[in-house]
Amino acid sequence: MVLKVFFPTCCASADSGLLVGRWVPGQSSAVILAVVHFPFIPIQVKELLAQVQKASQVPVAVLGTWCHRQQEPQESLGNFLEGLGTIFSHDPWLQLCRERGTRLWSCKATYPQMSNPLDMHPEEQVMLIFYDQRKLLLSWLHPPPVLPACQMGDTTASTGGLADIFDTVARSEVLFRNDQFDERPVRLSHWQSEGVEASILVELAKRASGPVCLLLASLLSLISAASACRLWKLWPLSFIRSKLSTCEQLHHRLKHLSFIFSTEKAQNPMQLMRKANMLVSVLLDVALGLLLLSWLHSNNRIGQLANALVPVADRVAEELQHLLQWLMGAPAGLKMNRALDQVLGRFFLYHIHLWISYIHLMSPFIEHILWHVGLSACLGLTVALSIFSDIIALLTFHIYCFYVYGARLYCLKIYGLSSLWRLFRGKKWNVLRQRVDSCSYDLDQLFIGTLLFTILVFLLPTTALYYLVFTLLRLLVITVQGLIHLLVDLINSLPLYSLGLRLCRPYRLAAGVKFRVLEKEAGRPLRLLMQINPLSYNHVMHIYRLPRCGCHPKHSWGTLCRKLVFGELIYPWRQREDKQD
């Protein structure tokens, strides 16, 4: 079996010393973490490794010797390194050396505790793999996508081996917590040996994050307790709360903020990434909301919107009146049932007059309402968009009423015709068994059924025309609201922090590794460079996408068409937990 030695590139120019790392026996791999420089006291090295092993739960040990032949005499150094194997006993004992003045490397693996002196790995069987310790420490290896069963075994084995390498470097972070000003008795070389990589602003933010999170968590817990009060569960408050998109969005953001400012430490990188994505999403949402707020309050745009709202509502009502008058005549040359046509037309015209009166009654207060609604943009653009969606729903409530009236009347006739059609065929619907059974009917039942079927058939075109027109209007309103909800869901669920990491620091999101051959020479160990393969953007979106608000059900095209054909009510006034008709 080939012995694999993972060596950090930051230690390639280190002075001679000891190789400190972890031996992975199941894979015949040695992960080098640091180099201990001369001079040192062996007992102090053992104490340091015991402390690191206790803190990180990683079996760190001295795996061998490192010889960088630049200044030391070769003979004296070689004699000294040979004697270290008796002090720090480990099987296998690695002897890694970089030739003086050249780029040639040599690596041997001996087993001093074995009785057979021939138990030595030739250099051809030792593979030297270089890796970037900083990138490997900061990255997180993701599991592979679902593969066919024939490839699953090999992929799981290789992924498990890489996971051990990544996990060893990540858990050994306590070994790297020293800098060039730390006067320890043991001097190490690793990726932070030249100084700890840190930022003053980051350190200040870490210091202040604890008290700030504790304060905000207390405030959010009070708000959550107030929102969970039993008063909100009483009718009609519970009904209004479940129907308004604004309440759903505020509840969704409250859960996000409670999770972000929770004092509990993230248990794994996935949870930490989720917190970061939520924080960036909230900050972007608030920033966009403040931009919208500044735009609304500049140049008196709220007053302009209020002055334009009433004429627009009057124009919509006027167009609806013209449409109803067209339907009450002979629309497109169709022969309608005049009596039913006049009844339905006057019924809907009366509702339009009521709606116009309601709009004119509210016109003096529209500017004040819009001003207070504009202030809600400081809570985020998603809250402002949700309020805008609710305003559209309220302003088009008469269209919704027309749609409900027409849909219920059309649905009643469809189900009546289907029942009477089963009566002609000697069938009936068995409610208990949910199936159609045979049934015998009397002559009077057949006569009344025939009469009712004829009446419903002749009245169906008039009802269907009104239902078709108001359904198209309702679908137009739903399309506008759907686009608004789509934008809200995009802001809520887009993993902006993960996408930013993938763009700026792709090694942080690792999907795997690739190897590049550095040297392949007879009599020398094969030298490879391990590089991180970043996660693709599609996988980043799939793995880190945040949950949506989910306040409205999502219908498939087949379900939507079936509901439209049979006159059943559709999105958005039905919630997921509601019963179906």
Curated annotation (Swiss-Prot):
Keywords, sorted A to Z: GPI-anchor biosynthesis, Membrane, Transmembrane, Transmembrane helix
Pathway: Glycolipid biosynthesis; glycosylphosphatidylinositol-anchor biosynthesis
Signal peptide positions on this chain: none
Subcellular location: Membrane
Regions that span the bilayer: 276-298, 344-366, 381-403, 446-468, 478-500
Pfam family, one: Gpi1
Protein name from the UniProt record: Phosphatidylinositol N-acetylglucosaminyltransferase subunit Q
Membrane topology summary: Multi-pass membrane protein
